[in-house]
Amino acid sequence: MSKDDVIEMQGTVLEALPNAMFEVELESGHKILAHISGKLRMNFIRILPGDKVTVELSPYDLTRGRITWRAK
């Protein structure tokens, strides 16, 4: 799957779950499970409930995603 195939959406973190997973509510109102991308993990970016984030979704599974950016 190439970078062009991913769907980027904005959302808000609702809850921090075990194993670096987060429940995120997208702007469209859908709730998904998302994990942190490797670069956020390497740079120790903290993500807390209430943070605005950018999430990448695969077109194959729209219920799971990867958090790629945390808004300031």
UniProtKB/Swiss-Prot annotation:
UniProt cross-references to SUPFAM superfamilies, sorted A to Z: Nucleic acid-binding proteins
A Pfam family matched in the record: eIF-1a
Keywords assigned: Cytoplasm, Initiation factor, Protein biosynthesis, RNA-binding, rRNA-binding
Cellular component terms per the entry's GO annotation: cytosol
InterPro entries cross-referenced by the UniProt entry: NA-bd_OB-fold, RNA-binding_domain_S1_IF1, S1_domain, TIF_IF1
Gene Ontology molecular function, alphabetical: ribosome binding; rRNA binding; translation initiation factor activity
Residue ranges constituting the S1-like domain according to the UniProt record: 1-72
Main location group: cytoplasm
Subcellular location field: Cytoplasm
Gene3D superfamilies: Nucleic acid-binding proteins
Keyword Ribonucleoprotein: no
UniProt function note: One of the essential components for the initiation of protein synthesis. Stabilizes the binding of IF-2 and IF-3 on the 30S subunit to which N-formylmethionyl-tRNA(fMet) subsequently binds. Helps modulate mRNA selection, yielding the 30S pre-initiation complex (PIC). Upon addition of the 50S ribosomal subunit IF-1, IF-2 and IF-3 are released leaving the mature 70S translation initiation complex.
PANTHER family (UniProt xref): TRANSLATION INITIATION FACTOR IF-1, CHLOROPLASTIC (PTHR33370:SF1)
Subunit structure: Component of the 30S ribosomal translation pre-initiation complex which assembles on the 30S ribosome in the order IF-2 and IF-3, IF-1 and N-formylmethionyl-tRNA(fMet); mRNA recruitment can occur at any time during PIC assembly.
NCBIfam families registered for this protein in UniProt: infA
Similarity remark: Belongs to the IF-1 family.
Protein name (database record): Translation initiation factor IF-1
Native source organism of the sequence: Clostridium kluyveri (strain ATCC 8527 / DSM 555 / NBRC 12016 / NCIMB 10680 / K1)
Lineage: Bacteria, Bacillati, Bacillota, Clostridia, Eubacteriales
Gene name as annotated: infA
